[in-house]
């Protein structure tokens, strides 16, 4: 009988986001082998032992272990959550220089192992650090993916679902652009249980005043959570789980991940959150959502915000 290749995932970064992602992956048994790498070796040992103790009660992978960058040599997916954390009052883009230096080191060591799989990046500012990862790794754009606006989209669906009294799964809505202050809601394509939002507002004008508030709640959610408890991690961990399943199980899902534009939306040479087909080969196709004039202007502004930052990143490579 022909051997079936096991799915191997390496997580780099065992902080709050990383350990939450590890728990979600192990609980759902998404990987056959799950390896955790972090400079805090005692923390990793503790988490590995803790996760292994839960194996009898979950759909766990057959192997959960502490490892090193050498373990990336035959990994299908490397997920990087490592990096300096976002502090209260600090924007994601404030983190650029220090996390770029961290990523140059991490990605360089991963590539030295012989890694030839897919990168999934979740450290902030995620669009910029995904760009850095592509630049350092030299891998094709399809195999370097950022978490993008997948969490923002989930927050948006949650807010809309709560407003209209339906499950978020019955909301068709997207946040695109930078995972940060310049992101935008694609209101023109938003539907609630199959009905266009604008049509709903015509018959429910009292809802109109809530629309901007819903977007602001979505955009600023991270700051609210950080102020309340210091960091966000459960939501993004679930988003990373969703992306990982799309890759490892070849699900062909369209997700608002951070993808590399090469002319799509009239822009290029930038990683940004856009609807993208994700499967075993990575981020294989970008879908150009129809945007109205206002949304197009906002998206182009988001591109410029990110390009201004990547210009400073490029200088760090000179």
Swiss-Prot record:
Pathway: Fermentation; pyruvate fermentation to lactate; (S)-lactate from pyruvate: step 1/1. Substrate binds at residues 86, 92, 124-127, 152-155, 232. Its EC number is 1.1.1.27. Its main location: cytoplasm. Keywords: Cytoplasm, NAD, Oxidoreductase, Phosphoprotein. It is found in: Cytoplasm. NAD(+) binds at residues 17, 38, 43, 69, 83-84, 105, 122-124, 147. It comes from the Bacteria. GO terms for molecular function: L-lactate dehydrogenase activity. CDD domains: HicDH_like. One of its GO terms (cellular component) is cytoplasm. Catalyzes the conversion of lactate to pyruvate. Belongs to the LDH/MDH superfamily. LDH family. Homotetramer. This is L-lactate dehydrogenase. The lineage of its organism: Bacteria, Bacillati, Bacillota, Bacilli, Bacillales. The gene is ldh.
């Amino acid at each position: 009988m022909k051997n079936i290749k096991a799915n191997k995932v390496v997580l780099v970064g065992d902080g709050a986001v990383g350990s939450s992602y590890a728990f979600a992956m192990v609980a759902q048994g998404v990987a056959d082998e799950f390896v955790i790498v972090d400079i805090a070796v005692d923390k990793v040992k503790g988490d590995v032992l803790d996760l292994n103790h839960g194996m009898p009660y979950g759909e766990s992978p057959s192997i959960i272990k502490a490892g090193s960058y050498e373990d990336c040599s035959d990994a299908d997916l490397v997920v990087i959550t490592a990096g300096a954390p976002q502090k209260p009052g600090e924007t994601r883009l404030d983190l650029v220089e220090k996390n770029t230096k961290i990523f140059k080191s991490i990605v360089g060591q991963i590539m030295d192992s012989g890694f030839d799989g897919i990168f999934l990046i979740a450290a902030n500012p995620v669009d910029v650090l995904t760009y850095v990862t592509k630049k350092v790794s030299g891998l094709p754009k399809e195999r370097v993916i950022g978490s993008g606006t997948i969490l923002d989209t989930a927050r948006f669906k949650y807010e809309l679902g709560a407003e209209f009294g339906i499950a978020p799964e019955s909301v068709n809505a997207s946040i695109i652009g930078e995972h940060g202050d310049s992101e935008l809601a694609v209101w023109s394509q938003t539907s609630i249980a199959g009905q266009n939002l604008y049509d709903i507002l015509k018959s429910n004008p009292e809802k109109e005043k809530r629309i901007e508030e819903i977007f602001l709640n979505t955009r600023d959610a991270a700051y609210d959570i950080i102020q309340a408890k210091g960091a966000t991690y459960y939501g993004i961990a679930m988003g990373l789980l969703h992306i990982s399943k799309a890759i490892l199980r070849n699900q062909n899902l369209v997700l608002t991940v951070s993808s590399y534009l090469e002319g799509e939306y009239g822009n290029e040479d930038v990683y940004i959150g856009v609807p993208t087909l994700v499967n075993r080969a990575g981020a294989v196709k970008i879908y150009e959502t129809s945007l109205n004039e206002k949304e197009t202007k906002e998206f182009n502004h988001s591109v410029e915000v990110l390009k201004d930052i990547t210009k400073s990143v490029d200088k760090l490579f000179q």
